[in-house]
Amino acid sequence: MATMSRQAYADMFGPTTGDRVRLADTDLWIQVEKDFTVYGDEVKFGGGKVIRDGMGQSQLPSAKVMDLVITNALILDYWGIVKADIGIKNGRIAAIGKAGNPDVQPNVDIIVGPGTDVIAGEGSIITAGGIDSHIHFICPQQIDEALASGVTTMIGGGTGPTTGTNATTVTPGPWNMARMLEAADCFPMNLGFLGKGNASLPESLSEQISAGAIGLKLHEDWGTTPASIDNCLSVAEETDTQVAIHTDTLNESGFVEDTIAAFKDRTIHTYHTEGAGGGHAPDIIRAAGLANVLPSSTNPTRPYTVNTADEHLDMLMVCHHLDPSIPEDVAFAESRIRRETIAAEDILHDLGAFSMIASDSQAMGRVGEVVMRTWQTAHKMKVQRGSLKGDPSEHDNFRAKRYVAKYTINPALAHGMAHEIGSVEVGKLADLVLWSPAFFGVKPNLIIKGGMIAMAKMGDPNASIPTPQPVHYRPMFGAYGKARQATTMTFISQAAMDAGIPEQLTLANRIGVVKGCRTVKKKDMLLNDWLPHLEVDPQTYEVRADGQLLTCEPAEVLPMAQRYFLF
């Protein structure tokens, strides 16, 4: 029986069971848990390789074979870290397992035929496309930036660089909602829009849901009072949509206890739950310990570094239309920036009490850094806190699964999209990202939308091969024409679907309908469902979880930073 060394095997087919892979320049290592490919019968494309007529490629017609196969990929998802071939059919993940030709190979469940294209996944890591659940739609150019970072779904609100959108993630009213839904047809990005939730009577909120909003946003700049919270959640309960909230920093209409009371145990997504992005000062972080609260962070505080606090003050003044010459405005800004709660946020992410990470794009957040900031946080916690319970010293599989869930499956669950997107699982839209391990979380190689490459690192188009410099991200064929619309989803509410909004607006994108938004709870946040009792000292801002002080030092140096970027 022929054998080959592990190194030679990894070089040819990628790592296999027991092999470890370092994530970029972090201190994080993942280990392959299972290999679904069959030793000796692996498939690989190229001259003298396996996927050729009569060998790894069958004679079957297109109806019985995959449209696209990704070979020998290392999948990193909340459910596992496995080596497998991935079969894609009609834009969806059709199978995860062993690809090839069943006429000559055993155990084939992904059939390759003349109608099949191939992406070589050997040596690459595959993740689900990221989901950014806190978007200010200030400019459409954000979408290219996000896509190039590995994000394939954006959830939020706005209508462009209006003063309202600069500060709040709100697309207010049916007319604005219709225009944004029409604009969504132009982008290779799944989009879902939040209406304005700040009202004390239901009619103006219900009409936004019927117009296409996937949920409502409560923001303090529009007046997040207990009455508006109660009313907004009541409308959401009737329409099976989600509510996102940015609470009252100034405690004008009530304190955190009043806001929690207004929730009445109903599900709500709390944005930037630590509070630097906004929320009851100094103790909105307490909400992360509630069973009905789905807590997320935005990336400016991810992770806590020596520069975090200083950077925030200037950002805050601009984003919330504050005047540095007005003492009250300066005091408002300073009340939101607390080193103690930001430090605690790091640890609460590591322990799974904070469930999601998003950007807060151009409104105190960087739209292209959700993935990177997530893994920087994971690295910082590994360095400062060591291995998590459940991880041996050799690898960080549990921690990696916990952190990847924060920007993939958990926001999908929170916003009723997990039946369509959010993970590398059979039946879901094939929104996938290929990474070289050395560039993991920083610069993806390929971004696949609905089974077709939408963006990629690409060299000089006039060169004789694809790789010569300058190499940068360029839109691919999946980002153009009707192909873009066939591979992209616009999400709306069931009420909007029943009202015929896609037909009324002649929307061209595939339509996804959100569901299960009112039944999802913290316990459903995969690998991120811890419910500690959180307390904040009103004088020192120290945070305790179940009585234990949560504190850590700010990072002075981070991975995934200047080693990869000039600016």
Swiss-Prot record:
Residues 129-567 form the Urease domain. Its cofactor is Ni cation. CDD domains: Urease_alpha (cd00375). The keyword Cytoplasm applies. InterPro entries: Amidohydro-rel, Metal-dep_hydrolase_composite, Metal_Hydrolase, Urease_alpha_N_dom, Urease_alpha_subunit, Urease_AS, Urease_asu, Urease_asu_c. Substrate binds at residue 219. Pathway: Nitrogen metabolism; urea degradation; CO(2) and NH(3) from urea (urease route): step 1/1. The active site is at 320 (proton donor). Binds 2 nickel ions per subunit. Ni(2+) 2 binds at residues 217, 246, 272. Disulfide bonds: none annotated. GO terms for molecular function: nickel cation binding; urease activity. It catalyses: urea + 2 H2O + H(+) = hydrogencarbonate + 2 NH4(+). Its EC number is 3.5.1.5. Carboxylation allows a single lysine to coordinate two nickel ions. Ni(2+) 1 binds at residues 134, 136, 217, 360. Heterotrimer of UreA (gamma), UreB (beta) and UreC (alpha) subunits. Three heterotrimers associate to form the active enzyme. PANTHER family: UREASE. Belongs to the metallo-dependent hydrolases superfamily. Urease alpha subunit family. This is Urease subunit alpha. It comes from Alcanivorax borkumensis (strain ATCC 700651 / DSM 11573 / NCIMB 13689 / SK2).
